[in-house]
A protein has these predicted regions:
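Alpha-helical transmembrane segments in inner-membrane proteins
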Residues: 1-346
């Protein structure tokens, strides 16, 4: 037990140090080459050699660091909770169709609305209309999932219903793409590639507040999640209200997925791969240790992905969803090969 606790502390410390190093790397490296001494001056509140460098560090790189850290943690926490409640190692935030709902909302704005949301009261265009469309789409699907949750007792049936919702939204998106203009299709395709640079410094407080709120709910669910590892009957004998826990979990994952997808686009593999990576590092399915390690590992992986995206320098920025499968897929393959050695739901 002492050895196990020591191992967990080592993992915590290593991940925390890795995050600090990756944050520093993301601040000092980017598509624009800024000398290290000037980055230090900017971070210290002094003037740099060029005014544009100050703008790049504070208005671009700093928000991207915080966004990547929170987004990685949010997606990973969602994946862990869904894998536990559905006892399915392949569950993640996209499996209930919530991220597909966000994608449908954006498709309606970009492909059908020409990038504008117009009502009799106000008109919203540009990036804000995309964020609002994604958020409303995700919340609409979340409301539908919560409604189905009140009717369907079986987790497996609810999972299947969520997958069907995802198929329906994907079909609607395909129809919108078919009838849309080439410019609209291109804009939607770029959004679908994912990007941590979509949150400005002014939007960062709202993004952080909503994400942290969802993460706090996830942390509060650690005890009932551990009870669910024993099975629904044992959990009920321990006084856990299965349906209430499931609804809270759906609400938390829905909020986290809606916020991250609306601001950053649909990001693949992080929510699916990181919980497995955390289990591999800890060798346990106890959420008291697993949840914090999952949050840290998710933040670290997202920061690493963001760093890789800007490595080409002035040649351009690599799409985020071109990087995440390269890092996430090998983890899943390793899990499939060594699934008997990994503690999942017991």
């Amino acid at each position: 037990m002492i050895h196990s606790d020591k191992k967990h502390y080592v993992v915590f410390g290593t991940l925390a140090l890795l995050i600090l190093l990756l944050v520093a790397a993301n601040l000092f490296l980017g598509s624009v080459n800024i000398p290290a001494q000037d980055v230090w001056r900017i971070l210290g509140g002094e003037e740099a050699e060029k005014a544009s460098w100050t703008f790049i560090v504070w208005e671009s790189r700093f928000p991207q660091c915080i966004t990547a850290l929170l987004c990685g943690a949010a997606l990973s926490a969602s994946g862990l909770m869904l894998q536990t409640v559905f006892s399915n190692p392949l569950a993640d935030s996209s499996i209930l169709g919530i991220s597909s709902g966000a994608s449908l909302g954006v498709a309606l704005v970009m492909l059908a609305g020409g990038g504008t949301i117009a009502t009799g009261v106000f008109t919203l265009s540009g990036f804000f209309s995309v964020i609002l469309g994604a958020f409303l789409g995700a919340v609409a699907v979340l409301a539908l999932v919560l409604f189905l949750s009140s009717l369907i007792k079986s987790n497996v049936m609810l999972l299947i219903a969520g997958i069907m919702i995802g198929y329906i939204t994907s079909s609607l998106i395909s129809l919108l793409n078919f009838f849309a203009t080439a410019e609209g299709v291109h804009s939607y395709m770029v959004w679908g590639m994912g990007n941590f640079g979509g949150v400005s410094l002014e939007q960062l407080p709202a993004f952080s507040l909503l994400t942290v709120a969802g993460l706090l709910v996830a942390v509060m669910l650690i005890k009932p999640l551990n009870a669910l590892l024993l099975g629904p009957r044992y959990a009920e004998n321990l006084g856990v209200n299965i349906r209430r826990v499931r609804n809270f979990l759906l609400l938390a994952t829905g909020l986290l997925t809606a916020v991250t997808t609306s601001f950053c686009g649909p990001i693949s593999f992080i929510g699916l791969a990181v919980p497995h990576l955390a289990r591999l590092m800890l060798g346990t399915s106890n959420h008291n240790s697993l949840m914090p390690v999952t949050l840290l590992a998710g933040g670290a992986l997202a920061l690493l992905c963001n760093l890789i995206c800007v490595l080409p320098g002035e040649s351009g920025v690599i799409p985020l969803n071109a990087v995440t499968p390269i890092l996430g897929a090998p983890v899943i393959i390793y899990v499939i090969i060594n699934q008997r050695r990994i503690q999942y739901f017991n």
